[in-house]
Amino acid sequence: MEENKVEKQNINGKQEVVQIPIIVSNSYNKKYYLDERLNVLPREVKDTLKIIFVKLTEEVGGVAEVSFDNTEYDLVFKTYKNDDDFNYDEINANYKLSKIEREYAEIFSQIAEFCKFKLNGLV
């Protein structure tokens, strides 16, 4: 699955990645992506992440994405849709995503800590 990296220009004029997608579930092409660097997570955690994000996109449509923001050292949760998708339920998608954030806060906190070191080359 193609990564949807968000980049910005740093002080030296070079492009640097700001948000790195680590989890993506896409209802349009029925695909799920987990960044390969997260393969070290326990199997049950990876399975849980897949279940909750695939279920979310099956219920509300569109794409659900969790990215690591390497300037804020935090996870960014978002959902979005294709322009021609009139069945996407934005309000319900954002509500359910917020609920997932709260319900699995401990797991996401640990993933954010892992990403802070692993994705920033501090390990």
Question: What feature does the model see in each segment?
Answer:
Residues E2-K5, L122-V123:
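Non-catalytic accessory regions used for complex assembly or targeting
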Residues N4-E59:
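Negatively charged, low-complexity tracts enriched in Asp/Glu with abundant Ser/Thr
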Residues K14, G62-V63, L122:
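Intrinsically disordered, low-complexity regions
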Residues L34-D47, K96-L97, R102, I111, ...:
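A broad, low-amplitude sensor of folded, mature protein cores
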Residues T57-C115:
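Amphipathic protein-protein interaction modules
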